[in-house]
């Protein structure tokens, strides 16, 4: 069984969990549609340092990525995990009708309307969170399709005709995509804000490419607080917080904390080498 088959099987196995975990809050985006969110607030009494918005992968929901929500809230960021109805579980199910899961995912992650919905969801969540923590910086973090969303928000060119204002101060992309279905070669040269990319040595791409394709955005970006981290043995679903992922989760959240600390210190220097993870910086 290939890694891609394992990945696709894991996504199917998570469908029932996603359904059970969904919950609704009272957010409404600019077109009047509801936005489901899960909130992770900083510990009571702590001063909020800023806000963090988390954008799930295709088929994901606001009930996932708890390890990231908990980690960022512990760092005193008012954190919101956003559900995306145009690219959530139900949307993915519709895309795979009459197609394989792999084909359905490819159709969904290249659907411009799905991204437009994501941008509205994120804008609504950002506005709502800023009313509760009107201080510090704004972070956008995304995984998989959420990473593509994050890169486009940060200023990456794309093949889908999408454009959105660069509204965040810091960007974090887990499992970013290289050039292909979504991004042309050289798409990331215009990204100027601090950006952290994280992948794993078992984080294969949907098309079957190895994790090494995920390094392309980092290599293409201009220098200026850009990090690229590779976690030994981490899979695509580990970075989403599933599977035997405790070690991968710990290294992911540790790297995010180190990146934010280095950014605040003004030099953005990477940490000392550590077993199990490699970090490149420029």
Residue ranges and their predicted role:
Residues 1-8:
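Bacterial N-terminal signal peptides that target proteins for export
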Residues 123-190:
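Primarily recognizes the serine-hydrolase "nucleophile elbow" in alpha/beta-hydrolase
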Residues 24-134:
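Serine-hydrolase catalytic machinery in alpha/beta-hydrolase-like enzymes
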Residues 163-233:
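The feature captures the conserved acid-bearing segment of alpha/beta-hydrolase catalytic domains
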Residues 233-234, 240-282:
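Alpha/beta-hydrolase-fold serine-hydrolase catalytic core, especially in secreted/extracellular enzymes
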Residues 16-18:
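N-terminal signal peptide c-region/cleavage motif recognized by signal peptidases
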């Amino acid at each position: 069984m290939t890694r891609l088959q394992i990945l696709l099987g894991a996504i199917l196995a998570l469908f029932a969990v996603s359904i059970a975990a969904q919950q609704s809050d009272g957010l409404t985006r600019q077109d009047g549609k509801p936005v489901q969110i899960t909130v992770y607030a900083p510990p009571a009494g702590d001063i909020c340092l800023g806000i963090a918005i988390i954008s799930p992968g295709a088929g994901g929901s606001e009930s996932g990525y708890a390890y990231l929500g908990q980690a960022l809230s512990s760092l005193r960021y008012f954190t919101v995990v956003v559900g995306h109805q145009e690219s959530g579980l139900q949307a993915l199910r519709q895309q795979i009708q009459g197609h394989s899961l792999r084909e359905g995912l490819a159709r969904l992650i290249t659907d411009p309307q799905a991204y437009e919905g994501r941008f509205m969801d994120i804008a609504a969540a950002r506005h709502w969170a800023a009313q509760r923590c009107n201080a510090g910086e704004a972070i956008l973090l995304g995984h998989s399709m959420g990473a593509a969303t994050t890169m486009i928000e940060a200023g990456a060119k794309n093949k889908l005709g999408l454009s959105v204002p660069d509204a965040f101060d810091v960007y974090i992309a887990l499992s970013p995509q290289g050039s292909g279905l979504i991004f042309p070669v050289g798409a990331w040269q215009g990204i100027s804000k601090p950006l952290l990319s994280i992948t794993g040595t078992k984080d294969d791409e949907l098309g079957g490419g190895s994790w090494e394709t995920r390094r392309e955005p980092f290599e293409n970006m201009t220098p200026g607080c850009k990090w690229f981290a590779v976690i030994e043995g981490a899979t695509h679903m580990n970075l989403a917080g599933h599977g035997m992922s405790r070690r991968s989760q710990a290294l992911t959240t540790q790297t995010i904390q180190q990146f934010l600390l280095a950014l605040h210190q003004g030099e953005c220097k990477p940490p000392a080498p550590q077993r199990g993870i490699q970090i490149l910086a420029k």
